[in-house]
Regions:
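Active-site pocket-lining segments that scaffold enzyme catalytic pockets across diverse folds
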Residues: 1-12
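Short glycine/serine/threonine-rich phosphate/pyrophosphate-binding segments
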Residues: 1-3, 65-69, 142, 165
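N-terminal small/polar loop signature for handling phosphorylated ligands or for N-terminal nucleophile
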Residues: 10-67
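Short, structured coil segments at secondary-structure junctions
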Residues: 11-12, 75, 128
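Gly/Ser/Thr-rich active-site loops/lids in small-molecule metabolic enzymes
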Residues: 15-18, 78-96, 178-182
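Phosphate-binding and adjacent anionic-ligand microenvironments
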Residues: 51, 55-57, 61, 78-80, ...
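Short beta-strand-to-turn element immediately C-terminal to the catalytic PLP-Schiff-base lysine
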Residues: 70-73, 168
Length: 337
């Protein structure tokens, strides 16, 4: 409400409109069901004003300014939400591209993502010859990587699918203030090059491949629910799926045993700071499914990622629909339908 507009003004961005109803200090947050930009409903009033003003971009944060959500116009002029995976991908693509263009990139620079965040970031890092590190969910693990490399390597950006991002290493936690400023810079860069934020996203998909991510939360409240979640994880661990929505599983990662097993039964060790109750399955077509119990709520979470090839921006909607059908097939394979 205060810090983000001040930060944007500091960077010379004076054509900023704030939603009037949401500039009133009220800890009950009466304008939304939940003041969390992960939820589309939280951006309703912002979208209302963005349409009236014909704005270039909508950005939103939560009250403690750590998560950032955004929306922009697509090629048809329709407002679309940019999810957490897409946001993280755009941010890291821009940071790498900008540092290379300005001669600031060093061979020792690195980025970080969580293991459940889109694998397209790995493709970007690989093609751009930048070190990328995977860590567990939760920004403390990204901060850990920063601390471990302090004085030896430079962290230049990192994030997670749950709308948290950090550029540079000053804050050591997800930070919507710097993220919103970075987003504004990316939009200015796009405009200078005759593009929009949506065009930038499509360019990334065209170069590195299309990816669709979807998170499923299965709630199981109470003691019986907790036991059911434990049993689900035990069943997945002892009987991992061989097929996910028609895609053949070629690699299983178990972070509880820190082992990865391929289709031929070969086992390699996973290098992580400690064990965690997470399972991941990777398929021959790039499909990835991660499953873990929530650490704070009575639910088990499934993170699904499917791949395709996007040649033209006009294919995006059709590919998204195709991917969602694939995700439905994967849900059926997992017994979630």
């Amino acid at each position: 409400r205060v810090i983000i507009p001040r930060s944007l003004a500091f960077w010379g961005l004076d054509n900023v409109h704030c939603v009037p109803e949401q500039m009133i200090k009220d800890g009950n947050f009466p304008t939304v069901d939940s003041p969390n930009p992960e939820f589309a409903e939280a951006l309703t009033l912002g979208l209302r004003d963005a349409k009236k003003l014909d704005a270039d971009i909508l950005m939103a944060s939560d009250p403690d300014a750590d998560r950032v959500g955004m929306a922009c116009k697509n090629s048809k002029g329709q407002w679309v939400l940019i999810d957490g995976n897409q946001t993280c991908m755009i941010f890291l693509w821009y940071i790498i591209s900008n540092r290379k263009a300005t001669g600031k990139m060093k061979p020792s620079d690195f980025i970080v993502k969580t293991i459940v965040t889109t694998e397209l970031i790995h493709k970007i890092a690989e093609k751009q010859h930048v070190e990328m590190r995977d860590c567990y969910t939760g920004f403390k693990w990204i901060a850990r990587e920063i601390a471990l490399s302090e004085g030896k390597q430079q962290y230049i950006g990192g994030g997670e699918e749950s709308y948290g991002f950090l550029a540079e290493d000053f804050v050591r936690d997800k930070d919507a203030v710097s993220a919103c400023s970075l987003l504004a810079e990316i939009c200015a860069y796009a405009k200078d090059n005759g593009k929009t934020l949506y065009d930038i996203l499509m360019d990334i998909y065209k170069e590195y491949g299309f990816s669709k991510e979807h998170t499923i939360n299965v709630e199981r409240p109470g003691k019986a629910g907790a036991e059911e979640i434990q049993q689900m994880m035990a069943n997945f661990r002892s009987n991992p799926p061989k097929d996910l929505g028609g895609s053949t599983v070629v690699l299983c990662k178990d972070y509880k045993t820190l082992e990865a097993r391929d289709a031929d039964g070969n086992i390699t060790k996973l290098v992580m700071p400690e064990t965690s109750n997470v399972l991941q399955w990777f398929c021959n077509d790039g499909t990835k499914v991660s499953v873990r119990p929530s650490g704070t709520e009575p639910k088990i979470k499934f993170y699904i990622e499917v791949k395709d090839v996007l040649t033209y921006a006009s294919q995006y909607e059709a590919l998204s629909n195709k991917a969602m059908q694939k995700i439905e097939d994967i849900k059926e394979s997992l017994g979630l339908k």
